[in-house]
Amino acid sequence: MVEWTDSERAIINDIFATLDYEEIGRKSLTRCLIVYPWTQRYFGAFGNLYNAATIMANPLIAAHGTKILHGLDRALKNMDDIKNTYAELSLLHSDKLHVDPDNFRLLADCLTVVIAAKMGAAFTVDTQVAWQKFLSVVVSALGRQYH
């Protein structure tokens, strides 16, 4: 079990309190699909992903990005039991969707870049430490079924 300080909890909650889920979700997922094009293979049913412009304009990608952010909201609300909170989602991604678990880390990195850009100077070292810890726990929980 991960131990969270009051400061870490406050930082994570503050980040989520200011997030525009639609904007940040869309930007994070599109960034991941563009920067790491091999991740596109999991989104074949989402239509044309031919180039960066079509990915950025794809409403299904935008909607899925929003869904991902709402999924992170579940982790926020269950910070003391993220592993069990994501057990079913981990099973889905491993057994049914066959997602390479390294892609969770890539998406987390893209999400960090987008949030840091949005927050600017407010994304301090302490903020990044707490945020990276949170995402590391989420990524580990999502990859649980692969171990």
Swiss-Prot record:
GO biological process assignments: hydrogen peroxide catabolic process
Tissue expression pattern: Red blood cells.
Family indicated by similarity: Belongs to the globin family.
Keyword Metal-binding: yes
Function: Involved in oxygen transport from gills to the various peripheral tissues.
The gene coding this protein: hbb2
PROSITE patterns from the UniProt entry: GLOBIN
Domain Globin intervals: 3-147
A cellular-component GO term for this protein: hemoglobin complex
InterPro entries named among the record's database cross-references: Globin (IPR000971), Globin-like_sf (IPR009050), Globin/Proto (IPR012292), Hemoglobin_b (IPR002337), Hemoglobin_oxygen_transport (IPR050056)
Annotated source species: Arctogadus glacialis
Protein name: Hemoglobin subunit beta-2
Lineage: Eukaryota, Metazoa, Chordata, Craniata, Vertebrata
Assembly notes: Hb 3 is a heterotetramer of two alpha-2 and two beta-2 chains.
Miscellaneous section: Hb 3 displays a Bohr effect, which is enhanced by organophosphates, and a Root effect.
Chain residues that bind heme b: H64, H93
Gene Ontology molecular function: haptoglobin binding; heme binding; metal ion binding; organic acid binding; oxygen binding; oxygen carrier activity; peroxidase activity
Keywords, comma-separated and alphabetical: Heme, Iron, Metal-binding, Oxygen transport, Transport
